[in-house]
Amino acid sequence: MAEIKNYTLNFGPQHPAAHGVLRLVLELDGEVIQRADPHIGLLHRATEKLAESKTYIQSLPYMDRLDYVSMMSNEQAYCLAIEKLLGVDVPIRAQYIRVMYAEITRLLNHLLWLGAHGFDCGAMNILIYCFREREALFDMYEAVSGARMHAAYFRPGGVYRDLPDTMPQYRVSKIKNAKAIAALNENRQGSLLDFIDDFVAKFPRLVDEYETLLTDNRIWKQRTVGVGVVSPERALNLGFTGPMLRGSGFAWDLRKQQPYDVYDRMDFDIPVGKTGDCYDRYLVRIEEMRQSNRIIKQCIDWLRVNPGPVITSNHKVAAPDRESMKTNMEELIHHFKLFTEGFHVPEGEAYAAVEHPKGEFGIYIVSDGANKPYRLKIRPPGFPHLAAMDEMSRGHMIADAVAVIGTMDIVFGEIDR
């Protein structure tokens, strides 16, 4: 009898479930995966090298473009690393705003993950539900930074500006009449905090809607239960972090274990899985959204009653406010020097990691005392996860490879850097 050779299949980078530019070379025995070889680097933009020729402030917008669905979480790690080197104290109000926006970012990330993962596995409707909520979250980004995605809102020493007292309003147009506009503007009559508070009050019911669509859905369970199982020991050895590690039953969360900003003041739980399969990781992320909602609510309540500065008063590091810059010569000089020359960071090295929506996102900076980093290293959470693709998909069907890619929550901006 003739020997049957393994069949090789190229999956991606044009495949809609490849999440950007993933190319997988799959060795198949019939429809069963024998080996999966991920080919990366198709979105490499040399971010680490570019940062060496830019001032610390000029490199900040690059962070937004690493994991381009968790923008402010990337900025947070970068700012924390610079603040460690500078020894700058961040005002407490700025820390609360950072934590609130880090959790808004977590919701943005998890909603896109849920919509895309469901869509990849054949649940078409969940994507529309998730994008409905993402729209309100983008409005929160836009209210503080003017940008819906690449915000550059976190700055070394605090945040760029305080929360606004008004929300932008929709206006009557050719496609929307006055009645429709009034309904859209209903929760935009107050401040940004009122708008976020309104969203936080509604969100648990919306998460229940997602669970109604998927959690007990027979087809969803068939696609995810028992697929891509990773034991707790193996998850640790592979370098898993975030929901990938917690889905295997290991309660590790940097917000609890190594608190930064004001996470030590927050009351929230760490969800963990039991079996370490795609279904458990789905449940972990769903519960994470509920916990993020709790944290945002605590931040809103504190920010309402505690006014104060939102960025350090050291004008060598942070720009002075617009009004004083336009009336005071010294402030104008500070502003000009900061955005042309930047600030000089003392010699040394620092590593700062945050509990990014995808796992541990770390920034390692080596400074030689100049106004630019001597070396900047980015520790992406998705890189070790993708490295386990072969192990997680071996023995499964081709269709299960899509579920495994989805459960990793891969974005190539941060993997290829």
From Swiss-Prot:
Disulfide-bonded cysteines: none
Pfam families in the record: Complex1_49kDa (PF00346)
Enzymatic reactions: a quinone + NADH + 5 H(+)(in) = a quinol + NAD(+) + 4 H(+)(out)
Statement: the UniProt record of this protein carries the keyword Cell inner membrane: yes
GO cellular component: plasma membrane
E.C. no: 7.1.1.-
Subcellular location per the Swiss-Prot or TrEMBL entry: Cell inner membrane
GO MF annotation terms: NAD binding; NADH:ubiquinone reductase (non-electrogenic) activity; quinone binding
Bilayer topology: Peripheral membrane protein
SUPFAM superfamilies xrefs: HydB/Nqo4-like
Key words, A-Z: Cell inner membrane, Cell membrane, Membrane, NAD, Quinone, Translocase, Transport, Ubiquinone
Keyword Phosphoprotein listed: no
Enzyme class: translocase
Major location category of this protein: membrane
Highest taxon listed in the record's lineage: Bacteria
Quaternary structure and partners: NDH-1 is composed of 14 different subunits. Subunits NuoB, C, D, E, F, and G constitute the peripheral sector of the complex.
Family according to the record: Belongs to the complex I 49 kDa subunit family.
Function description: NDH-1 shuttles electrons from NADH, via FMN and iron-sulfur (Fe-S) centers, to quinones in the respiratory chain. The immediate electron acceptor for the enzyme in this species is believed to be ubiquinone. Couples the redox reaction to proton translocation (for every two electrons transferred, four hydrogen ions are translocated across the cytoplasmic membrane), and thus conserves the redox energy in a proton gradient.
Name the UniProt record assigns to this protein: NADH-quinone oxidoreductase subunit D
Organism: Polaromonas sp. (strain JS666 / ATCC BAA-500)
Taxonomic path: Bacteria, Pseudomonadati, Pseudomonadota, Betaproteobacteria, Burkholderiales
